[in-house]
């Protein structure tokens, strides 16, 4: 049993009422295993390994583009998934794999120096399109913003969303130093691409949710395919696929509460005799507008993070305060 915290302080400034300059400070005390490392299948969405040190976590500026519905973003510390649309109605905020809608090869939470453009068709429903670029080693003068060794991530997305449903196709290209999150049994340095390697990730996500809360839950599903190429690529770790399906009920027992269940397959190295399978279940109790308590349990089969393949259970009680 461990007691951990994650603290974020956002300093938001607007000059016109339509733009946003965000500076975020963050600290926490999660250890890398099992909850704090993006290489772990038990990685929690809200956990990072900061060892109690306060760090600058975000620094970016967003502003409207010239065309209607366009938002432009640039910054020294910006995340690719925050310049895109995560197409899912399943939002447990527990395991990292499900927080990126079962597509960690595309929505890999790459953070660094970058820029992006987002477009949403005006109205309650319509098309969306996003394109962004993040260099995770952009602050390193020996690599830079546009050097292939600088962990470059290019993410493109097109989709359609309406009040009750949505669907999107996403693509990400990664270079040396990038990685697919929550990968099981991958060859190489924890899944990080080596010199002369590139990755191409593809994802199709869709969801549907009822007009009103009741016994019928929202349904979310995803399929992802990832391909790694390059002269240094081990033959045993070129292709992988991921999928997930999740259901979530709203206003369970009381308004504002939620519960859900999700199951999925993380990326697995092709050499594994059995692929990993993971699931989670949660119930979120809304104490007030600013406080929630979420007990959750989860399970991973054939987890390669430990000595030999093993099946592991886990659980958390996540309390969140916002102000």
Regions inferred by a protein language model and the residue ranges of each:
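Outer-membrane beta-barrel "beta-signal"
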Residues: 311-323
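Detector for outer-membrane/organellar transmembrane beta-barrel domains
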Residues: 124-126, 149, 160-278
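Outer membrane beta-barrel
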Residues: 2-138, 159-161, 237, 244-268
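Outer-membrane beta-barrel proteins
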Residues: 32-34, 83-86, 140-142, 178-180, ...
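Transmembrane beta-barrel outer-membrane domains
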Residues: 2-4, 49-56, 106-110, 147-151, ...
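Extracellular loop and loop/strand-boundary signature of outer-membrane beta-barrel proteins
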Residues: 44-47, 99-103, 141-144, 187-193, ...
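Membrane-embedded beta-strands of outer-membrane beta-barrel proteins
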Residues: 9, 59, 115, 156, ...
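Internal helix-turn-beta structural module
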Residues: 275-313
């Amino acid at each position: 049993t461990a007691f951990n915290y994650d603290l974020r302080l956002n300093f938001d400034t607007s000059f016109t009422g339509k733009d946003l300059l965000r500076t975020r400070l963050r600290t926490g005390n999660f250890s890398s295993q099992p909850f704090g490392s993006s290489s772990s299948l038990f990685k929690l969405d809200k956990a990072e390994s900061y060892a109690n040190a306060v760090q600058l976590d975000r620094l970016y500026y967003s502003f409207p583009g010239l065309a209607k519905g366009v938002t432009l973003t640039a910054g020294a510390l910006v995340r690719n998934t925050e310049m895109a649309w995560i197409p899912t109605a399943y939002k447990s905020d527990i395991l990292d794999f499900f927080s990126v809608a079962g597509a960690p090869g595309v929505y890999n939470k790459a953070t660094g120096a970058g820029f992006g453009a987002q477009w949403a068709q005006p109205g309650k429903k319509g098309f969306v399109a996003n394109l962004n670029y993040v260099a995770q080693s952009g602050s390193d003068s020996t690599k830079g913003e546009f050097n292939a060794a600088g962990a470059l991530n290019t993410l493109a997305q097109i989709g359609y969303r309406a009040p009750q449903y949505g669907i999107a196709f996403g693509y990400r290209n990664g270079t040396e130093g990038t990685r697919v999150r929550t990968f099981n049994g991958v060859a190489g340095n924890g899944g990080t691409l080596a010199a002369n390697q590139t990755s191409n990730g593809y994802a199709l996500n869709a969801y549907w949710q009822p007009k009103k809360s009741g016994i019928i839950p929202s349904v979310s599903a995803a399929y992802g395919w990832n391909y790694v190429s390059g002269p240094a690529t081990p033959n045993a770790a070129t292709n992988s696929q991921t999928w997930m399906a999740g259901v979530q009920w709203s206003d369970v027992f009381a308004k504002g509460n939620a519960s859900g269940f999700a199951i999925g397959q993380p990326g697995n190295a092709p050499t594994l005799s059995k692929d990993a399978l993971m699931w989670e279940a949660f119930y979120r109790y809304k104490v007030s507008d600013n406080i929630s308590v979420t007990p959750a349990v989860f399970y991973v089969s054939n987890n390669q993070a430990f000595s030999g393949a093993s099946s592991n259970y886990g659980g958390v009680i996540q309390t969140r305060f916002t102000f």
